[in-house]
């Protein structure tokens, strides 16, 4: 009897070790923070020639290669017609120079438009107005309740954006004001940092909404849940990252962002990503 118990105990130890090793390998594999390219494609009758957008969000002063060379190489290889910034590019003061350098590289080569995220209202040494000045000096057009009708690859497109406002401020009239000067026949892209507010934008004639903020829910268990925790959504967020389609024809892309620094919870099976969007004709 003692021999049987000893054998069973040994088997249980071996099983526990195998499970522990497998779990360790699984977690370590998931901690790979290599930069990822995430591509989306949409068909519309509002364009004839294709338009390509690079969407950069939640960078938080992170580094991908020296002077962010890996990120810049990926953007350049995608050959975008325009670069859009989804907010929370800047973070702690020690990362500001890193961010300035990246944005300078972008504006040297591309037209760059963006919005502020929630961290613009949380930084100790910089106010939102300070960041607006920095963006302007670097050549970024910030969209604050504003739309620009751009000509990209021979096609008109509305690029619109709104800041994230402090929690006690709402949306009353702001979205309609923002969209007032759009070309109603052109494809419309709306930049807004928080995806959980998508219902505010529904039914407004927006074709594509671009958001960030969630950092992909930090942890992903492939095939089980798409993120464990996101700000303003709590545990198991519905809009953690990816593409969401709504019945009014609006699509929402939530970037999982690029942040690898200053994160309390590590990213697991949730690599930082550059989003590239292609808008093509269905005619």
Predicted segments with their positions:
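Conserved beta-sheet core of the metallophosphoesterase superfamily
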Residues: 195-275
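Extended recognition/assembly regions associated with phosphoester-bond processing machinery
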Residues: 33-44, 178-186, 191, 195-196, ...
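Membrane-embedded segments
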Residues: 48-143
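Binuclear metal-dependent hydrolase catalytic cores centered on His/Asp/Glu-rich metal-binding motifs
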Residues: 129-140, 147, 152-191, 198-199, ...
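Beta-strand-turn-beta hairpins that frame and shape the catalytic cleft
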Residues: 41-54, 140, 147-160, 183-185, ...
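N-terminal membrane-anchoring alpha-helices
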Residues: 1-47
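Short, Asp-centered acidic motifs that coordinate Mg2+ and/or phosphate
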Residues: 81-82, 113, 140-141, 157, ...
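Active-site metal-binding loops of divalent metal-dependent hydrolases
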Residues: 56-61, 87-89, 118-120, 146-147, ...
